[in-house]
């Protein structure tokens, strides 16, 4: 299986944005040209490398890997194995694009991970948000994994889970969603969704429903749609946070009405 992957050093930095991240791994496919070598992406950590995947069709992998979904899960597993000697690691998928270039956001996250325990910090994910504080939202489940900071312990834990599940299932929904993911309050590094083979295998709803959802959110063909998508996620979080107060107010008003 090790023959299915190769590695290439693409950048080193003496002054990275994240002082508390040891390595950035960009997951890509052989002959892919999707990754945009944005200077910010190449300066996230001290070292940035490609993990180049030949793919399950061209290289023998475990028998359960029969779709791009499982192939991507296996690629994450392999990246975690490669990074065993490192502490905090950033994993980028090769369609990751920078949305927000304001350096202060990245510095805030770096300061946080330098003084706090964490599992996964996302720089661009969606889901059912719950506000944690002014800096982060929690989300369960989560969707989209194109830019994640993952602690060493969490990578080890997810590897075990991937082995137990034989690499079956989506990385975000099956493996990351159970890890108390923190999502930064602004989308920083995002992806533009297109009709890839992996998209064709999205689960949880019919394909037409996924297409409709990302169209409503504005995530197709324009990365600026992520601001709208975050607003939707944040608004739903506010509704859930205050729903008990709203319900109590309704009950109180009904009580007053019935007393008349």
Residue ranges and their predicted role:
Residues 2-92, 96-260:
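An acidic/histidine-cluster motif and surrounding catalytic segment
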């Amino acid at each position: 299986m090790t023959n299915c992957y190769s590695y290439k050093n693409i950048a080193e930095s003496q002054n990275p944005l994240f002082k508390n991240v040891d390595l950035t791994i960009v997951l890509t496919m052989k002959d892919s040209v999707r990754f945009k070598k944005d200077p910010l992406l190449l300066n996230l950590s001290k070292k940035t490398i490609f993990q180049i995947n030949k793919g399950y069709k061209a290289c023998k992998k475990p028998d359960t890997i029969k779709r791009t979904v499982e192939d991507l899960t296996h690629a994450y597993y392999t990246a975690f194995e490669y990074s065993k000697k490192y502490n905090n690691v950033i994993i980028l998928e090769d369609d990751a694009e920078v949305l927000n270039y304001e350096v202060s956001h990245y510095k805030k996250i770096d300061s946080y991970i330098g003084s706090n325990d964490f599992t996964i910090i996302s720089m661009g994910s969606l889901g059912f948000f719950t506000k944690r504080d002014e800096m982060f939202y929690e989300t369960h489940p989560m969707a989209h994994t194109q830019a994640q900071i993952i602690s060493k312990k969490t990578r080890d834990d997810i590897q075990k889970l991937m082995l137990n599940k034989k690499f079956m299932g989506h990385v975000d929904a099956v493996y990351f969603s159970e890890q108390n993911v923190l999502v930064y309050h602004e989308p920083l590094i995002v992806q533009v969704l297109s009709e890839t083979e992996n998209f064709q295998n999205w689960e949880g709803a019919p394909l037409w429903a996924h297409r409709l959802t990302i169209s409503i959110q504005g995530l197709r063909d324009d990365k600026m749609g992520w601001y709208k998508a975050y607003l939707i996620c944040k608004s739903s979080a506010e509704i859930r946070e205050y729903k008990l107060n709203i319900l109590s107010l309704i009950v109180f008003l009904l009580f007053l009405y019935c007393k008349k």
